[in-house]
From Swiss-Prot:
GO biological process: mitochondrial transcription
Pfam families for this protein: RNA_pol, RPOL_N
UniProt catalytic activity: RNA(n) + a ribonucleoside 5'-triphosphate = RNA(n+1) + diphosphate
Record protein name field: DNA-directed RNA polymerase 2, chloroplastic/mitochondrial
GO molecular function: DNA binding; DNA-directed RNA polymerase activity
Active site: D721, K796, D953
Role: DNA-dependent RNA polymerase catalyzes the transcription of DNA into RNA using the four ribonucleoside triphosphates as substrates.
InterPro entries recorded: DNA-dir_RNA_pol_helix_hairp_sf, DNA-dir_Rpol_C_phage-type, DNA-dir_Rpol_phage-type, DNA/RNA_pol_sf, RNA_POL_N_sf, RPOL_N
Gene: RPOT2
Cytoplasm listed as a keyword: no
Subcellular location: Plastid, Chloroplast; Mitochondrion
UniProt entry keywords in alphabetical sequence: Chloroplast, DNA-directed RNA polymerase, Mitochondrion, Nucleotidyltransferase, Plastid, Transcription, Transferase, Transit peptide
Amino acid sequence: MSSTKTPISLTIKLNQFTDKPTGLDINPYHNSPIMWRNIIKQLSSRTPQKLLFSSKNRTYSFLGFGQDSIFKDNTKFRSLIPISCSNIVMGFQNLGEYLPGDEFLSRPLIKNQVNNNFCCRKSYASVAEAVAVSSTDAEEDVSVVDEVHELLTELKKEEKKQFAFRRRKQRMLTSGMGHRKYQTLKRRQVKVETEAWEQAAKEYKELLFDMCEQKLAPNLPYVKSLFLGWFEPLRDKIAEEQELCSQGKSKAAYAKYFYQLPADMMAVITMHKLMGLLMTGGDHGTARVVQAALVIGDAIEQEVRIHNFLEKTKKQKAEKDKQKEDGEHVTQEQEKLRKKVTNLMKKQKLRAVGQIVRRQDDSKPWGQDARAKVGSRLIDLLLQTAYIQPPANQLAVDPPDIRPAFVHSVRTVAKETKSASRRYGIIQCDELVFKGLERTARHMVIPYMPMLVPPVKWTGYDKGGHLYLPSYVMRTHGARQQREAVKRASRNQLQPVFEALDTLGNTKWRINKRVLSVVDRIWAGGGRLADLVDRDDAPLPEEPDTEDEALRTKWRWKVKSVKKENRERHSQRCDIELKLAVARKMKDEESFFYPHNVDFRGRAYPMHPHLNHLGSDICRGVLEFAEGRPLGESGLRWLKIHLANLFAGGVEKLSLEGRIGFTENHMDDIFDSSDKPLEGRRWWLNAEDPFQCLAVCINLSEAVRSSSPETSVSHIPVHQDGSCNGLQHYAALGRDKLGAAAVNLVAGEKPADVYSGIAARVLDIMKRDAQRDPAEFPDAVRARVLVNQVDRKLVKQTVMTSVYGVTYIGARDQIKRRLKERGAIADDSELFGAACYAAKVTLTALGEMFEAARSIMTWLGECAKIIASENEPVRWTTPLGLPVVQPYRKIGRHLIKTSLQILTLQRETEKVMVKRQRTAFPPNFIHSLDGSHMMMTAVACRRAGLNFAGVHDSYWTHACDVDKLNRILREKFVELYEAPILEKLLESFQTSYPTLLFPPLPERGDFDMRDVLESPYFFN
């Protein structure tokens, strides 16, 4: 064997569909692979091998060639993947990818100026070179077996990188956008995520300049002028405080955190975050100090991290020439890293910036105390500098009425069960600011907007979602054990969950402009239509001109009631403004995306909080799929069914053919609604979901009026909803025939209505009780009163919440509210007694119809009680591998002193809440199962080429694909419950707590799960 040790790089061609490499290409110009077994042969052989290079027959070692190489001097060896496949560097990710650990900093690139390929010098740039380092001569005392293992290991690494690369490229292709368009949108997305606060601060500074130069302030919207008036004095106060802190003159505990961000950005964040809390809080323009301080402090810390990183690398660049010789390498690598981040908004290397910054930033998280102190100080400074002046409507000689915009006060709330009271600090805005809050949304910085490009694929607890904004795969709400459980889980274990979230996040949406224009017209006209709140407050009743205390007491109660209603209206108006602000901002985008994450039970949610498909009718009405698909004959049928479902009012309980008939009988109304939504007969306003109904009216009208309705394109998401889905899961767990029939797990001519079924049972029991002697059975009188009040509406809420473990007291209060609404029983004591009796009968009827569900619910609760009694939280793993830890622990209190007040921070203790662990486990376990079913369906739909969106127990796709969706969701439900779910749960409990004794599994019925496949109304 030749002793020449000049290494060559071998191009490894990987097959994305197999686990084995297809061959090794050592020809720099052609793909003429040597089969894998031949390479192994060469490795295993101790004799020289002859390899053929471009028809030249020479003798080479496996990893070298003679000094008279056949390759030209200027030859640069090829990268791992051919040029046509968007090369990645040997051992490197493609542009925009992230290399873990020190690998990121350790590989300088050499670029071939001819073919734009890259190779790595002084690193294991290829499998061949990696093996070459360990053995290039048959005489060395290294095992050939070790060489083979090393080769296999390196191949596996490269294959994983290539597979990830191909998946990402495929995602880009399936997103329906070319490379150039994708990069343009990506740059915009990064600006949205990284420059929002900076741009807001810049805008205020420019407005201040314009105001001074051109007197433009009077032309600003009222709320914008308020923000502008507060910005400069707040910024200056912050700057003064920062100077004291940076010079060491401030002894405050927050001092070392306070000067890490420019004063203008801190001012903007403080104003916007506080106003956001005042808008979204439901308490009449107030926010709790502790909540506001933590929210503001957290936002400041997030901005500080990236700011510190960029500033640190700037300084390192400036000091490069002063570095000692042994530190030059570090400086060079830091400079390379800085360039990667600073080019973030211009180039492709965006995906990993969050991880880069976190890895390079060696500063520890601030902690809750520091965030609270920084936030409190900023609120304190805003209180000192923010003033408001009513519009000028007084004589010039009068002094201006200038008053603080915000007031800090303490609120005392009496506890229900104790004589003691609870006190907490609040920030309350002036009435003028309060009235302006509803118009503030369009001027607010709204983080976590829908994305312009597909979200980053999830690969870990904090790796995925947004390109740059902090994103976490689970909403743990500070539950440490839950967070640690997810972090400990392997990527392989969580891959099914990651894949499902990626599927949901890759669904493309757009704004339905026609529906949005109707919403805007109604809102501009004062609301009051289509369930939109009245934009005006209800007038307060006039004070009676009398000394009669009874009349005055009645008046005071009316005033209190009207004020409560006005507070609710205000909250709803703010909510609508936020939704419309997002819709208006996104209406001209061709498409956008919602990154998703899960709650601790495994239910998926969009990360954007305001305008999303989990929201109200107005959200769902203005959102539609960005991709349109021809209806086809099946799609036209399902669009008609969908319209009937949205109209509701009992229509949704008809058979599918009955619903189609309803729609066809109202085609004139549908045309009128589409053509003249506000000027015509307004039939669509009678629907239970009016804006969604209007959207379907428009689409259906276009299709029916076209020359070929089947080829008409539809963007409408058509829903398939479960029938009391929680009870469906219980019936499947218990193989309960009676329960399965009640919730449509078996086929029927029309959908079974579980609420009507329970109401019928309740009525039978009450009729029987009404015949009894009141002297022996006191409830007989109540039964006689209630017989005429029993219907599905009376029992619906109790049946719905039964899956959540509703208690007798909860059921009593629910039924009492329904009876009070009807005014059937005037006397309060009689009303209470009737509600008690009705609740008892309703729960009895539920137990009879869903006996298996009750027994499973009881078993789950008993297991949870046994575990929690050992001071352990209940843990389980969902069918998709997500670890769940119930977060219910007793809360401890921690006092910290801030510049504003003493704050009480809540912290988890080590003591679990036994009762809460027990009562919450059954519904949480069922939610983890419905989340698993939705995720399984989502992934299967993607693989079948369907667009999919999900809202827990409501699955959406294009009208033309509903039949495919129905088949898939039924198959996945059967697949889910063919697994021994309860057996595995019990086994996991026994393994985790071997010293505890758990009750045996409840008996189950003989319902055949495969009957679900033939049930048309299981989801419909």
